């Protein structure tokens, strides 16, 4: 890494997850990691694997995913951004490129992550909305959604709403923000936490929708949170979920296992 021009680059990227089998490289299927590594390889990148802030499942999108790569690049960060975007497929885009210290780790240095989930209320399926939102009809009661969302704020054992990637792994997470907003044709959920369990965001959305529809009580949700007993929840569809932003406060946090949403 001592050669002139070699530096660690932080990439902020966005992608439409619809036609990807998730972010992580796996076999011959199309993934965000495989596309980005192939493109970086054309620009002289030689590492074995890219590092990402968080893993996203098949069909999940991102508007603020973070990756790092070490590259011997003789031009500006802006030029690298342009060179990558000229070569990447239409459903992936690099929004920003900057150099970071060699020790920077996109996952372990993240202080929190923020996910958004979009629901639209229409009696008939809208093809132009379907890639990025979950259609629910009749419309949900926003007040009930907000009532349920507040329960999740704070430090809790979320084992009823997701699982650790490793057996016996820590299932305690701290949620800083959990709230719903009305949109023109539905609502949007925003959640920020220090980290997430496997499928945690989509399970939380599903449970809140069930409560808003009268399928479960607030007591059921509180009990699930207090006792870690699964509510046997389903999963909200991947298409409504976006990894919106990864926050860094300059401190390295404890190394929680990777989460997938």
Where are these regions (language model features)?
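Structured-RNA-binding interfaces characteristic of tRNA pseudouridine synthases
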Residues: 2-261
